[in-house]
Amino acid sequence: MFLFICNTNYNMAAQGKAVVNKCGEKYMKIEYQENKNRQGILSVILKSLLIVTFLFIEILLLIGSVFEGKSVLVSNRMMFILGIIGYCIYLAFNRKKIPRSVIVENVGLAVSSLILLVVQLIIIYNIIFQTSWDVEAVWYGAHWAAIGDKLGLEQMSEYFSLCPNNLFLVVIFSSILKLNNMLGEPFSNGGLLLAIFQAIMINLAGLILFKCAKRFVTVANAWKIYFVYSILVGISGWIVLPYSDGMGVIFPILLLYIYIRIRECNGEVQRCGYILLLSVIAVVGYYVKPYTSIVFIAIIVIETTNWWKKLISNYSRTMLLTMMRNIVIGVITMVVCNTLILGMNRSVGFDLDKERAMGWQHYLMIGVNVESWGGYNDADLAFAKSFNDKEIRNKREMQLIVERIQNMGVKGCAELFAHKASKNFLDGNWGWGTDKSFYKEIYPSRSNGLCTYLRSWYYGFENLYCYNATIRQFIWIIVLIMIPFASFTLKTLQSEQKVLFLAVLGFMLYLQIFESHARYVFVFVPLFLILAFVGSENLKTLLNLFFQYKSEQK
């Protein structure tokens, strides 16, 4: 009897344990499915936002003359139609496959990059000119810093007190000019030397873009991305103006590439090294072009959601310690790098007044200016300069921001939003020649026929420029057409895809809120191109499925 009772109790305990285990397994499956659904929800949100955003942009393209560029030969509406026809022709004849040999890729990439650099040098040598606005200020600041001219530094102190965001660019450029002086000035034109250095950076960005693009599209499309990049960015007129726009191109794509490498590597030591590098590049990029940090912010957001899901579904002490280690490495690296850069900025020699520095309120105030449609305005700058106290200036600018929004009303805000979007994203030449005193000083023509042709092709007031502008605008419109199709997939977005989507959307939102200018998009063109070719691949897949379905119906 005793044995029977013990056996019965044992069986009941075993059954109870089995029930508990089944319940536990069921709970874990439900929790896992919920986590999976949450991950799917994030993908759906990003896809939907991308579609809505770029459909809005394409509606602006089709509106007509309200948002037309002045230098192109064909209307945006006609380019939109021609772009669709051109893509259909491309699909019909795009049958060639490119070999995947890494050696062939690297050799081809090196040769292509060398050819691009030679073309860039020819363009820079023949068309370089002196412009005004911030480019001129940075150039003179770097020049005076390189030769140690105290009077020149004193004269430029007011500008850099107002715009301290350009100080690190002066550090970089003045270092290059100092090296040129130490070598006996092999380059007598310092602006030419800086433009060449910038061209090299843009060239490196193209190499990184190709390597990065292979993680999102086929090798064949990665080559096409590189080719389009070479046209839109590599041989753009902006390469001859050494400034943060050209220097900043490398940072968004480099941040994305390093993030991909972090996710691909298996060794913890290697991963820590990449995290350290990512943190350094994020800080350097911020001091060269502040909004490049949007990519880094996107990485932080996506990785935070990833870690949170892992901790909920499969908590472990090791996982938590790994996360804390990565955070500590990143934070310490960024603090050290930030301290070093601030020290270098102070060492230049400008007499800076911190109370004169314009904060984010100033750029938000510009962003809601109806007169300039969110662009630079002399009156806004004069208003900001009239205050010597930072706190008072920020307060008055916030008051003016509220007043402008109230005066616009809902209809006015919508109109401003549309105008800013068209101004920011519909110009494939990125505002070339639109800034005040853009062609301030044009150097004497080189003694060759090519110089005359290139200047006519690039200078906005010459005869051939309209053809250059039209070609670039046409290519850019095709890019805009393709981007929404990047969302046309049933697959859940991978982490690197989420970062790409979020970074582009975040950047576009940034320009819609703060000061707008088409040339700001120049920095993010590599990310736009990847999205466009992802969309192209998705569209091609959808069309193939459609025609396959039609043939089966017959």
Can you say where each PLM-predicted feature lies in the sequence?
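Start-transfer (signal-anchor) and selected internal transmembrane alpha helices
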Residues: 1-122, 321-331, 552-553
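Short acidic/glycine- and proline-prone juxtamembrane loop motifs at membrane-interface regions
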Residues: 240-248
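Short hydrophobic/aromatic helix or loop-helix immediately within or flanking a transmembrane segment
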Residues: 140-143, 158-186
